[in-house]
Amino acid sequence: MLQRFLVKPFSFCTLSSVMAMSAAVQADTLSWGDAETDLGKLTVSGWVRANYQDKDYSDSDHKLKFNAAKLSLKYDAKTFFGNAEYRCYQNDTLCDFSTLVNANLGYKLSDDSRITVGLQDMPFGIGRFWSSSWYGSSMDNAGLEDVHNLGINWQQQLGDNTSLNLAYFVRDGGGFVGDGDAAPYAANYVKLEDATTDDIEEKNMWVARISQQIPLQDSPVKLNVGGSYWHSDLENSNGQTGHRNAWNIFGRLNYQKANLTLTAGQNRADTKSLSNADYATVGSFESKYFVANKANYYVANVDYQINDFYKNYDLTPYASYTVFDKDKSGFATSTRSILGAQLDVQQFSLAAEYITGKNDVFIGGDAGSLAGGDTSGHSRLLNLLFIYNF
């Protein structure tokens, strides 16, 4: 059964100074050391989050409760660097779902080139996130956005305006504390309890991305465009091996404090399934559901930052719209729209999001929403988040 969605542990950690590194305490981070030295600098940051939700498609608790927490470690030195991120979420009890999101180390080949090894986000799309919202676009649930896998990534800066990534990922990021193989952070292929259902494992993922800053002389407008491609093997338990071929093009237009981001792409997965050739089982955040194997997708996002909106308060309104248009005749298109705003003051943030979904697995839908669709029509969610950043 599809379980309710957890908006993306926090355990309190005591860090002692190591090898006489000096400590610098800032308003939002803790850091030790100097990144310009061989020993390097360690930075600790994160947040703790509570939420309140109101849904028109189910009985809401209408209670403010702990939702999630994040702990991040960042290491930077003259030659080496690294990153670790750990999160915990509450479904029924504190941290009943927790996961390692990133854990990697890197080496700086030169000022313009570096290589990263370990669990990390894949260089697919304009960045890790394609929208400004906390809830995320439905491409997150489809397994195309905010994907974290185990592999190696080479990044090269070509001149002042061009960035290139070439990466290889041997397997998915796996699950940790939670409901078995449905407990990864990123959406990946999983197996249903039905023994007759194909078991799909994605391996040997090759990903490439190029991003180009377009120089616009004497203009306050900044334009970045690019594209990415993803090819992988899909090993089926029936002994056959299929492939995924996915791509997208993207662009970001910036004018002063305003940003417009557009993404358009295509996902083609041939799982070699003898029972369900048109969709596969995906799992994340302790939920299992179906995703169409072949679809086009579109994500649009706009945000505007207003500094000192009121005294020391900063305000960022934003909006996003996602379309997952499946190829299979009779499969209904999935959409998600989000209108939101975030208010920040010092280390505290308040975010409010009004979300409308149709054929949306986590907004009033069911396990088949991202495949054939559902009969729920438009469903709505009000999501309020209270965040303490450190």
Give the location of each predicted region.
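Repeated loop/turn-to-beta-strand initiation elements of outer-membrane beta-barrel proteins
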Residues: 42, 79-84, 112-115, 160-164, ...
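Residues that define the transmembrane beta-barrel architecture of outer-membrane proteins
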Residues: 60-69, 97-101, 146-150, 202-206, ...
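Outer-membrane beta-barrel "beta-signal"
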Residues: 208-210, 376-390
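Membrane-embedded beta-strand positions of outer-membrane beta-barrel proteins
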Residues: 46-48, 82-84, 117, 154, ...
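Transmembrane beta-strands of outer-membrane beta-barrel pores
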Residues: 50-56, 68-70, 77-81, 86-92, ...
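Detector for outer-membrane/organellar transmembrane beta-barrel domains
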Residues: 203, 211-214, 218-327, 335, ...
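Solvent-exposed loop segments that connect transmembrane elements
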Residues: 175-197, 237-239, 269-293, 360-376
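Outer membrane beta-barrel
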Residues: 33-54, 58-176, 211-217, 299
